[in-house]
């Protein structure tokens, strides 16, 4: 009978989703597509920081103090900002959280805060892409030295190799996209963030999708999971 009632109210089911995956796996793109499809907000920690700082909120002022010194915003403050964002009207049917948690302590703190509020995460979607693919994807990016336009040597090449289509200036490989930099970021990810996969698997909310296929195919696989 309980299942029957749940099915009847399927339309109103609240969907609280966390996106997992290595940097460059495409989780941000998929988060935006999920948000559009299910009419729930795509929430990233960067956006929350910027909005609170811009609006001069108490939490925003505290976060700005750390950021101005080039320090990481402490987990506790980040979590306060996130939980505050969840109270907004547009989150009443759920949200897609992207970029948090990144560590087990963050995941445990989020879990505790949600439980205290009588809430829980419904899905943790892991976009799986091997390191080799990510290094190739990211080290293929090129940026224009003048106008900042971005391209990719394989997926979005310019008409003339190494020259910006828009302004005709030279393209460069940014330091952030150099293979060794990308691999270093992936090493940090495997050490800090990979354990989250087991954390959410143990909670029975993990869903894994192959992120090596076409972007639309990745999204279709996610839609199948979410229903």
Go through each PLM region and give its residues.
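Glycine-rich phosphate-binding loop of ATP-dependent small-molecule kinases
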Residues: 6-227
């Amino acid at each position: 009978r309980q299942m029957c009632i749940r099915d009847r109210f399927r339309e109103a089911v609240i969907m609280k989703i966390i996106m997992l995956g290595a940097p460059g796996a495409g989780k941000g793109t998929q988060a935006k597509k999920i948000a559009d499809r299910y009419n729930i907000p795509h929430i990233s920690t960067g956006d929350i920081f910027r909005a609170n700082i811009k609006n001069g909120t108490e939490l925003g002022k505290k976060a700005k103090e750390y950021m101005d010194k080039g320090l990481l915003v402490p987990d506790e403050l980040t979590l306060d900002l996130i939980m505050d964002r969840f109270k907004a009207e547009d989150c009443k049917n759920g949200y897609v959280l992207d970029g948090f948690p990144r560590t087990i302590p963050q995941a445990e703190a989020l879990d505790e805060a949600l439980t205290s509020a009588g809430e829980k995460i419904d899905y943790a979607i892991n976009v799986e892409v091997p390191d080799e693919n990510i290094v190739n994807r990211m080290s293929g990016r090129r940026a224009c030295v003048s106008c900042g336009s971005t391209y990719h040597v394989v997926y979005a090449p310019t008409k003339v190799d190494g020259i910006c289509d828009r302004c005709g200036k030279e393209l460069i490989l940014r330091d952030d996209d150099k293979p060794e930099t990308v691999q270093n970021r992936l090493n940090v990810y495997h050490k800090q963030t990979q354990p989250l996969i087991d954390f959410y698997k143990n909670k029975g909310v993990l869903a894994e999708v192959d992120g090596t296929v076409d972007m639309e195919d990745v999204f279709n696989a996610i839609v199948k999971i979410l229903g």
